[in-house]
Amino acid sequence: MEVIIGRDTAELAHVGADAFESLLNRKPDAVLGLATGSSPLSIYDELAARCQAGRVSFAKARGFTLDEYVGLPADHPENYRNVINTVFASRVDFAPGAVAGPDGLATDIPAACAAYEEAIRAAGGIDLQILGIGTDGHIGFNEPGSSLASRTRIKTLTRQTRVDNARFFGDDVDAVPAHCLTQGLGTIMAARHVVLVATGRSKAEAVHQLVEGAVSAMWPASILQHHPHATVLLDDAAAHRLQLADYYRETYRSKPDWQGI
């Protein structure tokens, strides 16, 4: 696991966008795993600017979203297909229909989850998955207690996650759906490269457990300690509980250019 502690959000956005740009320049038809939430927004902004400048193209790429609320109407602004289209996909040159998501309106939920797993496999697997992290250590909607080997499935959201997400629903916790479909931890671990971004002091405990804690289902993100190519992007506030923060900073400062991200 590589831990990068940036000076500010702008630096983290550049580093995260570099990972996408490098991949797409090597493999224009790459398969991308796309997360919603506030954490990746600065990276999406940077990628949109680079696409408009002609530095990177998504024309041959495909995308798979990480999760979706169950029962949220297709035209609801917080339906994650709409969210990812608004914050990212519509701002770059993805081909029509190139970004897919779990079907939160399916009548047969297990079949929809199996179909989503098969779609990812048929596309060749995810080359780069971007992630945020919840204050309780969840990634995707894999809440504490999730199986570390889980695949795409339905989950019940914790009260804390619904409280955290209420800001997207007019601060009304009861308006946040109680259930979701999410890629499982096993699905996420199958991605070839995982980039997780976390900013702010509220994420510091989750980041500490992710990077330096024991691998445990109680902190789902900690499974990334076992990933062969995981990159964690942090600002100072999110990193302030890390015991080896100075070492991570020094390692990144002295990293040779040829190593890439």
Q: Where are the predicted features?
A:
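N-terminal glycine-/serine-/threonine-rich phosphate-binding loop
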Residues: 1-32
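Glycine-rich N-terminal segment of FAD-binding domains in flavoprotein oxidoreductases
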Residues: 26-52
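Short beta-strand segments
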Residues: 33-37, 65, 102-103, 130-133, ...
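A glycine- and small-aliphatic-rich helix-loop capping segment at beta-alpha/alpha-beta transitions
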Residues: 46-57, 80-82, 144-154
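Ligand-binding beta-strand-loop-alpha-helix segment within the catalytic cores
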Residues: 56-129, 246, 251-260
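A short secondary-structure junction signal
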Residues: 111-113, 140-146, 150-152, 206-210, ...
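Class I SAM-dependent methyltransferase SAM-binding "motif I" and its flanking Rossmann-like core
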Residues: 136, 140-185
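ATP/nucleoside-binding phosphotransfer catalytic cores, i.e., glycine-rich phosphate-binding loops
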Residues: 186, 190-261
